[in-house]
Amino acid sequence: MVTLTPSSASTPKTSFDFMKNNNSHSSLYVSSSSYLSSKEDALVTTKKLMEPSKTLNMSINPKQEEFGDEKKMVKKAPEDPEIGVFGAEKYFNGDMDSDQGSSVLSLTNPEVERTVVDSKQSAKKSTGTPSVRSESSWNSQSVLLQNKLVNSCNSSFKEKKNSNGQIQKVTNNKKSFLANLGCKCACSDGDSVDVEEKTSVKRSADPNISVITMRSSADMNTELIKIQKQEELSQRKSLEVFGSPVAIEKKSSVVQKKLPLPPWKSRTEEDDTKSEGSDSSSDLFEIEGLTGNPKPFLTRQGSDPASPTCYAPSEVSVEWSIVTASAADFSVMSECATSPVRRNRPTQIPRIPITAKSAPQRRKSSSSSGGNGFLMSCKSHKSVMVSGDLDRRSSMNKTQPSYVPRFPMETTKPKSFETRRRISNSSISHTQSSLLYSQ
């Protein structure tokens, strides 16, 4: 028996029966006391001595404590049956130690329980070689790890001091959680995480690259289409489209020449081109007739020196010319006197060679002289001139009719100017008298 006397006189004396308490505890937990080490017992006893008011029950009458202990024994007796299957597995795995130690220390103090459990865990984890439990539960990768990783996990436990000066070990939750799960592989390094992020970025960038390539190809196609449209617009605006029709006809003729055609088609096309060329030439003749002289077949030729005017000579025209000449005091017969005269033939109207041709003759001449039907419009005028020259040559080769003097009184030999004047005056007087009689 130990008696403690407090300093204050007001508090009564209290007696603590350590022996009975110890005996009662020892009777309850005989099986569990064998597993406790001597160091743990020493820690428990020191804690009991340091904090008696918290750990031990204070009582004035020791009989009440005995009755309470007996009740506890009666209540906890059915809790100790025979060891079952799960209990045996826990016993062989080493879990019974931690459970029984915690149950014993729960009666004393939670702080003591924490320190004891932490000391056991640190003693187990301080060893470099893993136990059977760890080898069976951890993954295959944890067996191949080095001792440095284990030491790094053990270094995660940090020691802190309480206000009372006690040493308390506090673990880092994140690292302890990874250590319990056995994720001590090379994936947990920061570099490996960065590498995985890079690979994930690459994987995520691959579809973007494919999308970019698809977009770039689509953009190239659209650009090509735009370039083609611009070229078409430039061709439409160029001279090739809005140029002269002659160049277009030339190109079409060249293309038609290059394309080979069967003989029956070529013949029909030649006939068509000839007919088109002849029609175009006849149209040109009509246009020239409208724009130029109204009667081109009555025009004066270069080989006809006797026709002073553009009309055919007749009696009425001769008389009218004499009247006008007398009125203007001009002798028209001076020109006629120079022409050769034959007395044998009577007065005749000189025959004028007709250069005008019929429509089929003109078509033949134009088709023979033209060559290609496409260029007939350019050579139509020249072809007419050529035909006129041929007619002139033919008329020159033939015997030209002798021109008869209009007035038989004239002689072949030229006379002096005075005699010519007299003859002209006399002829004018005769014509005037004849006109008066006719009226």
Swiss-Prot record:
Q: In which tissues is it expressed?
A: Expressed in young seedlings in both darkness and light. Moderate in leaves and very low in roots and flowers. Expressed in the elongation zone of the root and hypocotyl.
Q: From the record, what ranges are coiled-coil?
A: none
Induction record? Up-regulated by white, red, far-red and blue light.
* Keyword Acetylation assigned: no
Q: Which family does it belong to?
A: Belongs to the PKS family.
Provenance organism: Arabidopsis thaliana
Observed effect of gene inactivation: Increased hypocotyl growth inhibition and cotyledon unfolding responses in the very low fluence response (VLFR) mode. Reduced phototropic response. Reduced hyponasty when grown under blue light. Loss of negative root phototropism. Auxin accumulation in protoplasts.
Q: What is this protein called?
A: Protein PHYTOCHROME KINASE SUBSTRATE 1
Its organism's taxonomic lineage begins at: Eukaryota, Viridiplantae, Streptophyta, Embryophyta, Tracheophyta
Q: Which gene encodes it?
A: PKS1
Where the protein is mainly located, per its record? Answer: membrane
Which membrane topology describes this protein?
Peripheral membrane protein
**Biased composition, Basic and acidic residues: where in the chain?**
63-79, 412-421
